[in-house]
Amino acid sequence: QRGVKFPCDALFRDGRLIAWLCPCREQANLLVRDGFEEYTPLALWKDYAARPLYGVSMLGTFHMPMRDGVELAADVYLPEGAPLPVPALLVRTPYDKDDGAQTYFRYVRRGYAVVVQDVRGRNESGGEWLPHYYEVEDGDDTLTWVGTQEWCDGSVGMLGGSYLGYTQWCAAALGNPHLKAMISVVTAGTAFADGPLHGGCFSSGGFAWNFAMTKRRFAPERMDRADWDEILDIRPLEDIGQKALGEDVPFIRKMLAHPCEDSFW
């Protein structure tokens, strides 16, 4: 229901609607009648909104080396005309860095560098795709790379929802000094308890997402099936990829091999 049932705030004065606010992940839609701005969050952002806007310049695609030698691809965007160095915002995604990157241009226009990275094994990044497994070390290494670039002032924030929110908590786990802020939305707590397994039981609801993540690029069409009841009856679960997709899915097998909260998680 995420596309149709966002919460809304309505503000009335003398029985008349004067403002309406609908928050949606990292953005919000606000409509307000002229003259009533002081009753809304706009009053808090008045000075910020008056600051100059910059153009968006793509510095390039960079392949960042991780501690084990694997390189992860990231696109870097800089505020055109802004005095460097500037603080940076980092987004780590399994859904292809070049898909929807324009969403983050509003931050570039406000004077931030933005770095959008494919996590390990996804899209243009090297290495093995194993959900959740590498995000702590990779996140820490990425923060260090971003924070030490000549265009960055050493301060890095992170943002994003769902898996993009999970990568933030992982990146924060080792206490990287460059990480100064996080906006983590609709995300999980731990990989074991809130991800593939819930209370020790493998979550059947996660198979649709797993199917969409079997290729190097996100393939949401693989979730759109009419035979999910039959698929979820397949036993053993390790065979679900071969029988439902006609191919083995190694990361599903690896997760199923660890039904307890051991060092894998």
Model-predicted segments: where are they?
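Accessory cap/linker subdomain of secreted extracellular hydrolases
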Residues: 109, 173-265
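Acidic, serine/threonine-rich low-complexity disordered tracts
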Residues: 1-50
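N-terminal cap/lid segment of alpha/beta-hydrolase-fold proteins
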Residues: 44-84
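Short amphipathic alpha-helix adjacent to the substrate-entry channel of hydrolases
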Residues: 93, 99-117
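Short beta-to-alpha linker loops that shape the active-site pocket of alpha/beta-hydrolase fold enzymes
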Residues: 80, 95, 113, 118-122, ...
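Glycine-rich "HGGG/HGxG" loop immediately N-terminal to the catalytic nucleophile
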Residues: 121-131
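Alpha/beta-hydrolase fold nucleophile elbow
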Residues: 150-163
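Alpha/beta-hydrolase active-site loop
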Residues: 130-150
